[in-house]
Regions:
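Rossmann-fold NAD(P)-binding glycine/threonine-rich loop
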Residues: 1-14, 111-160
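Glycine-rich phosphate/diphosphate-binding loop of Rossmann-like nucleotide-binding domains
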Residues: 19-105, 109, 121-123, 127-128, ...
């Protein structure tokens, strides 16, 4: 089973909005936002990361929900300025504590997908201090990773 939609046919179906499923971690992001009643329609969502496993697929899923999506990465010019415009940030850049409090506006929703091991401890891509400014914040560990694991189990149990 292709739980991360890496097969070119499945990736193409996802791109065209016709896929019966999506990669597990992007699905986990969407399920978490839905569970907590986070409105996406018309919201400016910045996806920080452009991987084929998280960044691009989650951007496609957000577009299907009528969000306005900007995809950024560690080399985006004036990244703090772009992030400060976001209503929602999905961080999947793979750099520990990369997003700092001065890079986001008050009330932002943070979905931290990053999982980075530093000296035996796990850190997300968003500095934990950002939680004080956020209206919603997924922690690392204990956030999207847990939901992503549930999505893997869901995919493996399906008769596709």
């Amino acid at each position: 089973k292709d739980v991360d939609c890496l097969n070119p046919l499945n990736a193409g179906e996802l791109y065209l909005g016709r896929s019966r499923w999506a990669p597990c971690t992007p699905r986990a992001c969407m399920a978490t936002l839905s569970h907590y009643g986070i409105e996406l329609k018309g919201k400016h969502v910045v996806v920080l990361g452009r991987s084929n496993v998280v960044g691009k697929p989650v951007a496609l899923l957000l577009l299907q929900e009528h969000a306005t999506v900007t995809i950024c990465h560690s080399r985006t010019q004036d990244l703090p300025g772009v992030l400060r415009q976001a209503d929602i940030i999905v961080a999947a850049v793979g750099i520990p504590s990369f997003v700092k409090p001065d890079m986001v506006k008050d009330g932002v929703v943070i979905v931290d997908v990053g999982i980075n091991a530093v000296d035996g401890k796990l850190f997300g891509d968003v500095d934990a201090a950002v939680a004080e400014k956020a209206s919603a914040f997924t922690p690392v560990p204990g956030g999207i990773g847990v939901v992503s694991n549930m999505m893997v189990m869901d995919m493996l149990s399906r008769d596709l």
